[in-house]
Amino acid sequence: MNSRRDFIKKSGIGFAGLLITPSIFNNILLDSKQDIGIQLFTVREQLNQDVKLTLKKIADIGFKQVETFYGYGDKMSGKGFWGLDAKELAQLLKTYGLKSGSGHYNTTQYLTDGNTEVLKQQIEVANTLSQKYYTIPAMAPNVRQNGTVDGYKKMADLFNKAGELCKNNGLTLAYHNHAFEFATLEHKQTGFDILLKETDIKLLKFELDIFWVVNAGIDPITLFKQNEGRFAMWHVKDMDKTDNKVFTEVGTGRIDYKTIFENRKLAGNKFIFIEQDVIKKDPFESIAQSFSYVKQNLVK
């Protein structure tokens, strides 16, 4: 990614001739520095079949960033990363000109018993891949199924502790939402409200899954306005125009991504990862279609 100095040099302008406000300049930088990423869960079956070919195809489409997932056993990703250890994957990503800004890590054990040993091992993996964010992909099963105010407060405490551990190891902790966190609990609170309130803004960022936010009936822009700067990453995936439970390629559904992307600075967005949980066409055609829409219409 280009530095601020590189941007000015390549634009052929200097500070003396820069007749735009700092806020506009920041928006230009956000756009010029935005690498479009993909959550690799989108092509999980293809990775299991041929990790090298799949990553090459991802790079050929134009993606520059990938978000990994790790710790889910043979069915999801085999040993390590589809038979590769972290060093081998890091080298393969480098070969294809890919970087990994974030990784999803299986934190079920930690969120259940508070044991940090697995976290420490996974943090080593994240650092080997030069990732910036260690991302908790889902809530503890008991809280997901039977969430309470106290349950979410306990999760917030565990997030803060994990966030401190990540910070001490050069990473930032993030949490990836689904729709259930927005269900109303006691005193008209939601689980997401509690996580926002009870976690340290310096220790936890959120990876906002736009699909699940809209599925829950929540306006993403309202979240940005109420919690400015907390949504460092987004999962960008679209929703079928007739069925809010069906995924579709970005730009073909009902989610107003143009307005959402206009508010990236307000959200604090640093990374975007295209994702589609279920695909009904050739997966590489699908992700190429979503990539093309994002590049041509959302990232200038």
Task: Give a label for each model feature.
Residues 11-13, 17-23, 110-205, 284:
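Active-site acidic/histidine proton-transfer and metal-coordination neighborhood
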Residues 68-90:
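Glycine-rich, proline-tolerant flexible connector loops at the mouths of alpha/beta enzymes
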Residues 47-58, 114-124, 217-223:
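Short, acidic/polar
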Residues 53-71, 129-130:
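Catalytic domains of carbohydrate-active enzymes, especially glycoside hydrolases
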